[in-house]
C-alpha cells in the first residue's frame, strides 16, 4: 500500500489477489500515523482468511442476489455434503467429478478432498483471484480447474479451442459415460427480473437480471415465466446441455 497524493492506494501490480481496488483519501498523514501508534494493525497471517471468509459483507445485497455468491453458511455446506455421501456412497468423491458453476469464492467446495475431481467457475474474475489466493493458503483446489465463466451467457468451448472451459471438464461433459459421473453442485443466484408491481402490470423488469441472458433467450419458450428466476435458468441449461449428470442444488422447492 502506497501513500500518494494525500491518499493510500494499492499498486496495480499487486491487484491480482486483493479483495477490491480502492483509494482511501487521508487529509492529514500525521493524524493517520498517530492513530496507528495507538492501535495494532491486524497481523496478515492471522486475519487474512477470516476477512476473506466474510468478504460478502462488503458487497451490496442486490449485487449478491444477482451474482449468487456468499449464501452458503458453513453448517449448510457440511450438511449438503453429508446428503451427497448418503446418496452417492462413502467413496463418492473418488467416483464422481464435481463442478460448482456458481462458485463465488469457493465456499461450497470447502471440505471436499479430491482436488483432481473438483471444478469451480464464477462470474467475476475478482472471485477467481480470491480462490487462487485461497489455494496458496491451502484450499484443496487446482488452479487450472478454477476459472471465470458466465454460466448463463458463455458457451461450452474448451480452452484448446479458444474457450473458457478447462479441457478436462469439457472432456467430461462431452462424454456420455463420464457425464453420468458429474455432480453439478450449486447454490445458484435467486434474483428475478420482476417485482410485485411488474407482476400486476404496473412496474418494469429489473435491468441487468434474468431476462438479459443468452440462456433466457434460448429456452424461454420451454420455461416461460419461470425464466425470470436466475436459478431456473441454471437448471434448464444443466438439464438440456449436460444431460444425465447429477444436480445437487440448494433449494426450498
Q: What feature does the model see in each segment?
A:
Residues 60-68, 216-222:
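Glycine- and acidic
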Residues 72, 76, 164, 226-230:
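Soluble or luminal CAZymes and related metallo-dependent hydrolases
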Residues 154-179:
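Short amphipathic alpha-helix with an adjacent loop that forms part of the alpha/beta core around
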Residues 172-193:
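Carboxylate/His-rich catalytic cores and anion/metal-binding grooves
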Residues 66, 72-157:
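Conserved S-adenosyl-L-methionine
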Residues 219-253:
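Conserved Class I SAM-dependent methyltransferase catalytic core
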Residues 190-227:
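A mobile, often basic/glycine-rich helix-loop segment
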Residues 1-66:
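A short N-terminal interaction module
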Amino acid at each position: 500500500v502506497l501513500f500518494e497524493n494525500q491518499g493510500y492506494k494499492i499498486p496495480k501490480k499487486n491487484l491480482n489477489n486483493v479483495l477490491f481496488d480502492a483509494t482511501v483519501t487521508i487529509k492529514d498523514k500525521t493524524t493517520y500515523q498517530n492513530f496507528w501508534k495507538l492501535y495494532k494493525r491486524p497481523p496478515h497471517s492471522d486475519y487474512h482468511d477470516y476477512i476473506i471468509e466474510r468478504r460478502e459483507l462488503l458487497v451490496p445485497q442486490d449485487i449478491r442476489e444477482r451474482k449468487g455468491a456468499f449464501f452458503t453458511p458453513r453448517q449448510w455446506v457440511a450438511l449438503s455434503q453429508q446428503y451427497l455421501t448418503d446418496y452417492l456412497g462413502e467413496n463418492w468423491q473418488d467416483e464422481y467429478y464435481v463442478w460448482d458453476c456458481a462458485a463465488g469464492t469457493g465456499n461450497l467446495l470447502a471440505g471436499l478432498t479430491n482436488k483432481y475431481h473438483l471444478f469451480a467457475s464464477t462470474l467475476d474474475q475478482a472471485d477467481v483471484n480470491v480462490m487462487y489466493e485461497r489455494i496458496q493458503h491451502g484450499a484443496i483446489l487446482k488452479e487450472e480447474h478454477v476459472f471465470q465463466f458466465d454460466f448463463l451467457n458463455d458457451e461450452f468451448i474448451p480452452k484448446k479451442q479458444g474457450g473458457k472451459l478447462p479441457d478436462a471438464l469439457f472432456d467430461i461433459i462431452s462424454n456420455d459415460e463420464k457425464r453420468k459421473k458429474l455432480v453439478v453442485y450449486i447454490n445458484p443466484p435467486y434474483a428475478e427480473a420482476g417485482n410485485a408491481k411488474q407482476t400486476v402490470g404496473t412496474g418494469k423488469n429489473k435491468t441487468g437480471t434474468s431476462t438479459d441472458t443468452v440462456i433466457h433467450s434460448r429456452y424461454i419458450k420451454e420455461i416461460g415465466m419461470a425464466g425470470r428466476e436466475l436459478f431456473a435458468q441454471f437448471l434448464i441449461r444443466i438439464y438440456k446441455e449436460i444431460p444425465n449428470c447429477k444436480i445437487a442444488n440448494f433449494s426450498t422447492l
